[in-house]
Amino acid sequence: HQKYNPFRFVELVLVVDKAM
């Protein structure tokens, strides 16, 4: 089941920020 995880979004933002 898919459950929205805000921490997953934060982790994605950190990865994108590090890439840029």
Curated annotation (Swiss-Prot):
Q: How is the cofactor bound?
A: Binds 1 zinc ion per subunit.
Q: How does activity depend on temperature?
A: Activity is stable between 20-40 degrees Celsius, decreases at higher temperatures and is lost at 70 degrees Celsius.
Q: How does its activity hinge on pH? A: Optimum pH is 7-9.
Q: Which UniProt keywords apply?
A: Fibrinogenolytic toxin, Hemorrhagic toxin, Hemostasis impairing toxin, Hydrolase, Metal-binding, Metalloprotease, Protease, Secreted, Toxin, Zinc
List, separated by semicolons, the cofactors it needs.
Zn(2+)
Q: How is its activity regulated?
A: Inhibited by ethylenediaminetetraacetic acid (EDTA) and 1,10-phenanthroline. Not inhibited by tosyl-L-lysine chloromethyl ketone (TCLK) and phenylmethanesulfonylfluoride (PMSF).
- Compartment(s) where it occurs, according to its Swiss-Prot or TrEMBL record: Secreted
Main localization of the protein described in the UniProt heading: secreted
Tissue and organ expression note: Expressed by the venom gland.
Record GO terms (molecular function): metal ion binding; metalloendopeptidase activity; toxin activity
> Any one cellular component term from GO for this entry?
extracellular region
In short, the EC number is 3.4.24.-
User: Which is a GO BP term held by this UniProt record?
Assistant: venom-mediated hemorrhage in another organism
Broad EC category: hydrolase
Q: Give the signal peptide range.
A: none
Assembly and partners are described as: Monomer.
Function, as annotated, reads:
Snake venom zinc metalloprotease that possesses hemorrhagic activity (minimum hemorrhagic dose, MHD=4.7 ug) when injected intradermally into mice. Degrades the alpha-chain of fibrinogen (FGA).
Record-stated family:
Belongs to the venom metalloproteinase (M12B) family. P-III subfamily.
Q: What is this protein called?
A: Zinc metalloproteinase-disintegrin-like uracoina-1
What is the originating organism of this protein? Crotalus vegrandis (Uracoan rattlesnake)
Give the organism's phylogenetic lineage: Eukaryota, Metazoa, Chordata, Craniata, Vertebrata
